[in-house]
Amino acid sequence: MAKEKTVYVCSNCGQDSPKWVGKCPSCGMWNTYVEEVVRKEVVNKRPVSGIETAKAKPVTLHEIVADDEPRIDLHDAELNRVLGGGLVQGSLVLIGGEPGIGKSTLVLQTVLRIPEKRILYVSGEESTRQLKLRADRLTSASSDCLIVCETSLEQIYVHIKNTRPDLVIIDSIQTISTETIDSSPGSLVQVRECSASILKFAKETNTPVILIGHINKEGSIAGPKVLEHIVDTVLQFEGDQHYMYRILRSIKNRFGSTAELGIYEMRQNGLRQVSNPSELLLSQDHDGMSGVAIASAIEGVRPFLIETQALVSSAVYGNPQRSATGFDLRRMNMLLAVLEKRVGFKLAQKDVFLNIAGGLKVNDPAIDLSVISAILSSNMDTEIERDTCMAGEVGLSGEIRPVNRIEQRIGEAEKLGFKQILIPKHNLQGMDTSKLKIEIIPVRKVEEAFRALFG
């Protein structure tokens, strides 16, 4: 019997070590090394794609025909946008996200909308009966999508060879294993080798493959982090399970922009595309309520208006509480320090709670002005006019710094009927405001924004 060799591999970056180490010297992450046992006789073997093809020959650059090949229309405007206009032939796409966020639902309802293509759906997690029940819940239309429950990579290639599909779905890559690797499914070695073999198959046969990958809730599993270096496109499906909205982001895309964003609404019968997220994210009944400010934000390349809510109250306990949902807590603490140092509001003995309505997580610095405005509104118990929105980054000296794509932000606010928008004064340079129906209020400092909002 061959002697087994133990290797410790970082589940975050793939760095290996003959012994366990607490901190990875390559990526700097702690407690990410896991033990992998490999056999010497198979350690250098790689799984083959199972498709016989001719050996590639070097050619000159001018001999290569680079005609634009039509992409596969997935009949999903949001997914097509994030992919860059559709699915590229021969591409390997990874859709990652936390368990239960809706990855399988997104992919299954997408393939059910493509009757003109022959699709093979490989499931390693659910039975065919479970998939049938899920499909009936998503749509009543019939589909010729082929479904097979299989976890062996070699058997999957046999099914592909027999069916010759136009598109292959594998749900999920963590459940697939190859016989050439003596390791359990979902391990770093299995995930890496199986995905590399699938990539080779996709390129050799010009067949697009969509992989679904899980991210552990603790973030300790290898999963999509390792796959990012292998696949062509990485899509991140994120959101809070307690809220209805889901966001599809492009993390890596060799065939399109990574600035695109798709927004969905989770319903009982599946995911619904949200073409105008601003109308859903804004509350319709906050008249007379303090602590509410509307921000014109941009996620990816899409502008939309979001509702920033703040609650400021006297600290009941010894230490004041600070809490932020959907916004960086450290940045909120910085903005509170700016309010106290530059504007003169004493909030050191106040509890401050901040919430981005709708369960969204926003990283756009242009919502700084709305965060400060909502906090001031709650602290003074004074309402901000409902037809007023704002966009601006706040600096440490209390200045309102310019933001990008200001025309798109103003246009979104004007489209939804807002009458006023506060913007950085620097953004006003070179802007033609004569055709705008919305009133532009330029501000340079937080004090000016305070006077414009509260008099």
Q: Language-model features: where?
A:
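Peripheral, non-AAA+ core regions of ATP-driven protein-machinery
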Residues: A2-N12, D16-R81, V88-L94, I101-V111, ...
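P-loop (Walker A) phosphate-binding loop of NTP-binding proteins
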Residues: E98, G124
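Conserved RecA-like ASCE P-loop NTPase motor core of nucleic-acid helicases/translocases
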Residues: I119-S123
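Divalent metal-dependent catalytic cores for phosphoryl transfer on phosphate-bearing substrates
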Residues: T128
